[in-house]
Regions:
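Membrane-embedded alpha-helical bundles that constitute the cytochrome b-like, heme-associated redox core
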Residues: 1-144
């Protein structure tokens, strides 16, 4: 399939799919009225995935993103998720954005979307680190 499409068309197809995924997330968010828990998680995962793709393209080494770059991404995606949820409630319902943002980091309100995105980002980063460690070339013993 890739060979038939050619590299340019394949890249174009990927860009179209990224745009469709963004539109699908926005559509999901618009269809949810007050319960925007799931669309917010979807948006956070999308932010993390697009950040990963960007890092892979800019700092990736042999198809992998180094762990020091994944850690800030694992922090940025949940923060953007919490900010998106706070912005939504502030614009749609007039709720204080700072209070909604702070609620994402309180355990009294249960697991919020930012916490779930953080857990997923950390889990994927750890799996990536273990995978890199297991596949790294091991020094071979030298015999005299």
């Amino acid at each position: 399939m890739i060979k038939r499409l050619g590299p340019r068309r394949w890249q174009r197809l990927h860009r179209i799919v990224y745009a469709i995924a963004l539109l699908a997330t926005v559509h999901y968010w618009m269809q949810s009225k007050l319960e925007i828990w799931e669309p917010t998680i979807m948006a956070g995962i999308y932010v993390w995935l697009m950040g990963y793709r960007l890092l892979l393209k800019t700092v990736g080494v042999r198809g992998r993103v180094p762990l020091p770059w994944l850690a800030p991404l694992a922090l940025a995606a949940p923060l953007l998720t919490a900010a998106g949820e706070a912005l939504y409630f502030s614009l749609a319902y007039g709720a204080p954005a700072l209070r909604v943002f702070e609620a994402n980091f309180s355990l009294q309100t249960g697991l919020r979307p930012a916490a779930i995105v953080f857990a997923l980002a950390v889990a994927v980063s750890l799996v990536s680190a273990v995978r890199n460690w297991l596949s790294s070339p091991k020094p071979r013993p030298r015999f005299a």
